[in-house]
Swiss-Prot record:
Forms dimers. Forms higher-order oligomers. Interacts with glycoprotein G (via N-terminus). Interacts with protein M2-1; this interaction directs the matrix protein localization to cytoplasmic inclusions comprising viral proteins L, N, P, and M2-1 and mediates the matrix protein association with the nucleocapsid. Interacts with host KPNB1; this interaction mediates nuclear import of the matrix protein early during infection. Interacts with host AP3M1; this interaction plays an essential role in trafficking the matrix protein in host cells. It comes from Human respiratory syncytial virus B (strain B1). It comes from the Viruses. This is Matrix protein. InterPro entries: Matrix_Pneumo_C (IPR055461), MATRX_N_pneumovirus (IPR005056), Pneu_matrix_N (IPR043062). It is found in: Virion; Host cytoplasm; Host nucleus; Host cell membrane. A motif (Nuclear export signal) lies at residues 194-206. Belongs to the pneumovirinae M protein family.
Length: 256
């Protein structure tokens, strides 16, 4: 089994983002990606990852209003994992690597092939796209970040378009909007890093919460879902070799 720890926060208390690569234990095993709902922990990361690698995982494919899903049950006797959710549902569209091999409505044990733990800031210092969308009234435009990454092993580059937030803009401000937003975002973002969670997510550390980053606490981490964007690459390969090199911004009017 492979284990990986990504420390994006060094505090004694942190938010744990845990993702597993597992293989079903049956005659025709499917490869699955399992991510655990984020939880708070004060356990040293090196100790937590050891306990995370020793759990038992059961999965069952089900149907929900959101589409095909997986019901996940985690069994552990470790007090260290007391804060970790043990029963939850995740999207099968992101989780399943080999859909045809996964039976419906059958509970199956899994073998853990890899486990990744990312230490993020405490929940009060995390912001998502959904959080910002709820705080924007009468939006007129949306801000898209075009995040460029480079594979340091091959020098290949990929640009991932990520929806950041809706904004409300007056007509008189439209001409200068893009320059203003680009300046604000460049001042606000100190880094961006891909981590394995719900497929993949982008973590942006924000230093300035003016203008486009209003409602985000300074020094907080902004989390953007990428899903299975780079699914053909292994999670470890992506997180080790894909480095953030640049970010451009696009301001688009909302479409009806």
């Amino acid at each position: 089994m492979e284990t990986y720890v990504n420390k994006l926060h060094e505090g004694s208390t942190y938010t744990a983002a845990v993702q597993y690569n597992v293989l079903e234990k049956d005659d025709d095993p499917a490869s699955l990606t399992i991510w655990v709902p984020m939880f708070q922990s004060s356990v040293p990361a090196d100790l937590l990852i050891k306990e995370l690698a020793s759990i038992n995982i059961l999965v069952k494919q089900i149907s929900t209003p959101k589409g095909p899903s997986l019901r996940v049950t985690i069994n552990s006797r470790s007090a260290v994992l007391a804060q970790m959710p043990s029963n939850f549902i995740i999207s099968a569209n992101v989780s399943l690597d080999e859909r045809s091999k996964l039976a419906y409505d059958v509970t199956t044990p899994c073998e853990i092939k890899a486990c990744s733990l990312t230490c993020l800031k405490v929940k009060s210092m995390l912001t998502t796209v959904k959080d910002l969308t709820m705080k924007t009234f009468n939006p007129t435009h949306e801000i898209i970040a075009l995040c460029e990454f480079e594979n340091i092993m091959t020098s290949k580059r990929v640009i991932i378009p990520t929806y950041l937030r809706p904004i409300s803009v007056k007509n008189k401000d439209l001409n200068s909007l893009e320059n203003i937003a680009t300046t604000e975002f460049k001042n606000a973002i100190t880094n961006a890093k891909i981590i394995p969670y719900a497929g993949l997510v982008l973590v942006i550390t924000v230093t300035d919460n003016k203008g486009a980053f209003k409602y985000i606490k300074p020094q907080s981490q902004f989390i953007v879902d990428l899903g299975a964007y780079l699914e053909k690459e292994s999670i470890y390969y992506v997180t080790t070799n894909w480095k953030h090199t640049a970010t451009r911004f696009s301001i688009k009017p909302l479409e009806d």
